[in-house]
Amino acid sequence: MVEVKKLTKNYGNIKAVDNISFTVGEGEILGFLGPNGAGKSTTMNIITGYISSTSGTVTIDGKEILENPKEAKAKIGYLPEIPPLYTDMTVKKYLEFMFDLKKVKLPKKEHIEEVMRLVRITEQADRIIKNLSKGYRQRVGFAQALLGNPPVLILDEPTVGLDPMQIIEIRKLIKSLGKKHTIILSSHVLSEISATCDRILVISNGKIVADAKTDELSSSTAGEEKLALVVEGAASDIISAIKNIPAV
């Protein structure tokens, strides 16, 4: 469904994305894990066609994003980290506007009602978006991504800034959408991706450093402990002391 081959993005002498390749199968929920600045959002923006790559290709359901941008983009629903909402509109008016902007070729009223039902915002249809909680605004963002029934959903940090209950609700929503869509979800939090995704790619400094099923990756990191210490003294003495610790 999604195929990325030898993707590279340079900003001057900096490689934001460094020759990465991966595929995502139909109906798969893929987690894209890495710290801030690792290259996650850059990769997402290339996949969705928002920016071009320096080299490499992205193919969405058989359509290459640069050669067939219109056809490829029509197969993608994108939810950026900050949803593109017009907060002075009502939920319904906003979705009608986005429906027209995307030139969706489906019955307008019925399709918008179905999308609102899927993300559970039907009762919020006539409310002004700026008066909604962050959790409901995120659901409106999901609704706009679903307009047109795209087979692929790209979700960039979809739970960032939400409270614990809202996070649980969004996780459930993503899992339910995964039954009918291929999903790529980015996050810098392993527990967040582990709770939602079938498979995890780990990216660091623009390179993929791990690719595994969620349970396999969770098992490989289980039992590891991290300890943060604050030490005082000469740097040379501290380094010497650390080197004398077994297994360090």
Positions of the model-derived regions?
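Conserved ABC transporter NBD signature motif
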Residues: G56-E67, E71-A72
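Hydrophobic anchor residue at the start of the ABC signature
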Residues: F142
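Walker A (P-loop) phosphate-binding loop of ABC-type ATPase nucleotide-binding domains
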Residues: P35-G39
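ABC transporter nucleotide-binding domain
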Residues: R171-V248
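Catalytic Walker B motif of ABC-type/P-loop ATPase nucleotide-binding domains
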Residues: L153-E157
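Conserved ABC ATPase "signature" region
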Residues: E96, D100-Q124
